[in-house]
Amino acid sequence: MSDVSNEAARRRTFAIISHPDAGKTTLTEKLLLFGGAIQMAGSVKGRKAARHATSDWMALEKERGISVTSSVMQFPYEGKIVNLLDTPGHADFGEDTYRVLTAVDSALMVIDVAKGVEERTIKLMEVCRLRDTPIMTFINKLDREGKNPIDLLDEVETVLGIQCAPVTWPIGMGQRLKGVVHLISGEVHLYEQGRNFTRQDSTIFPSLDAPGLAEKIGEQMLTELRDELELVQGASNPFDLDAYRAGQQTPVFFGSGVNNFGVQPLLDFFIEHAPPPQTRETTGRRVAPSETKLSGFVFKIQANMDPQHRDRVAFMRVCSGKFTAGMKTLHVRSGKDVKLANALTFMASDREIAAEAWPGDVIGIHNHGTISIGDTFTEGESLSFTGIPNFAPELFRRARLRDPLKLKQLQKGLAQLSEEGATQFFRPLMSNDLILGAVGVLQFDVVAYRLKDEYGVDAIFEPVSVTTARWVHCDNVKKLDEFREKNAGNLGIDAAGQLVYLAPTRVNLQLAQERAPDVRFSATREHAHAKAID
């Protein structure tokens, strides 16, 4: 095997998805803890001790205790390299999560034992389904009372439409929690509360028949457990690697992230069975990770990761070949050669200069406004990775300054923050309004906060008469010009220079579509085909 094939085979690149408050950020911390990437996990709730979760690095996230940007963290474990992409925990940031899911090879779904499958989980699962992403499931908060585990499996299968294969099974729950049984190895892991946020190895018995186990958990509970396991193993599906990798079956684990319990079996199983980097589609052909020439695509842009440097970083997933510091690449969309100097690797907000990177790795490229989400970099071949869309926003607001002299800073701030993809910035052709589009109200709060914190701009967002937006295209230049002339009052330009129809009502949009049959109105814009404004 070549170096590229060997290194690609070692990579495990995945994202964690969940409904808000299911314990995703805490579990992220504990995976890092067990992976040896951090010595002490920070509790998101532990405000007085000034402990904040490693993956919640932005000031606003630390204040609110929610993840609103996706972090990238890498750590070695058992001879493999794990790339963990944390996703926004808030529903308003679903588009960012969608794009993160285009950059991973598998996902870990976290479910609250008391709440079961929630609305956000359903939506995220639909996104994973589009790509047949392999998914493992961690049922969290076992230290609290919750739903019957058998009912939970049934709920996952019925609501999410995916077969469950339990790998660990709980012994009790809440106050009666004693541990979990590993259904494949037969081992029993006893529950001990994690203290001081440091890793603790649980006591493990080799089987249910091991001497001393009955004393630990009680004869009655052991008898109940044997009966329950007989029922579970008779009614559930055994783990099938092919079905899991095809996105048809999810291995299920039980545990308590906050108490470091049940995390180790999950991590070990993940390392052994999760897929390495896979072949990916481009506009021209399929690209295999084992190819020797570098290729990769940008799935996220983050402004001001280091407030002292006012920098913008483009996150690029390496799809094939080897990245080396300072190498020359082709920025396919612009057709220009770009030297990738000072690329970064990440441990949440800790950054290091990347000497090399392989398929499955994520590197950060310094961006001075020339890189967009969806851009492809290669060693010369003109191809673009597909399937990284921009969705039409559902809410629109006009930005208004409290200090009119700060207009330039406002324009710069809105343009740079919209590059990240969570919001979209539009300039109407016939007015000087600056319009921001988003899929949720929280995004306007975040932008207002960051404008003030990072750009020194005090802006408010007020209602504007725009209900929806559609990107417009027409192969006939003359007909497009006619359309622009007739509809100038409803047209604008997005941050990438694309023409957008800003409809005041859905009826208005319908009429515009009927009157211009040659013009295509699109609810999404594929980043791969976007043109940047100079």
Swiss-Prot record:
One of its GO terms (molecular function) is guanosine tetraphosphate binding. GTP binds at residues 18-25, 86-90, 140-143. It is found in: Cytoplasm. One of its GO terms (biological process) is regulation of translational termination. PROSITE patterns: G_TR_1, G_TR_2. SUPFAM superfamilies: EF-G C-terminal domain-like, P-loop containing nucleoside triphosphate hydrolases, Translation proteins. The keyword Nucleotide-binding applies. Transmembrane segments: none annotated. Increases the formation of ribosomal termination complexes and stimulates activities of RF-1 and RF-2. It binds guanine nucleotides and has strong preference for UGA stop codons. It may interact directly with the ribosome. The stimulation of RF-1 and RF-2 is significantly reduced by GTP and GDP, but not by GMP. Gene3D superfamilies: P-loop containing nucleotide triphosphate hydrolases, Peptide chain release factor 3, domain III. InterPro entries: EF-G-like_DII (IPR053905), EFG_III/V (IPR035647), G_TR_CS (IPR031157), P-loop_NTPase (IPR027417), PrfC (IPR004548), RF3_C (IPR032090), RF3_dom_3_sf (IPR038467), RF3_GTP-bd (IPR041732). This is Peptide chain release factor 3. Residues 9-278 form the tr-type G domain. Keywords: Cytoplasm, GTP-binding, Nucleotide-binding, Protein biosynthesis. One of its GO terms (cellular component) is cytosol. Belongs to the TRAFAC class translation factor GTPase superfamily. Classic translation factor GTPase family. PrfC subfamily.
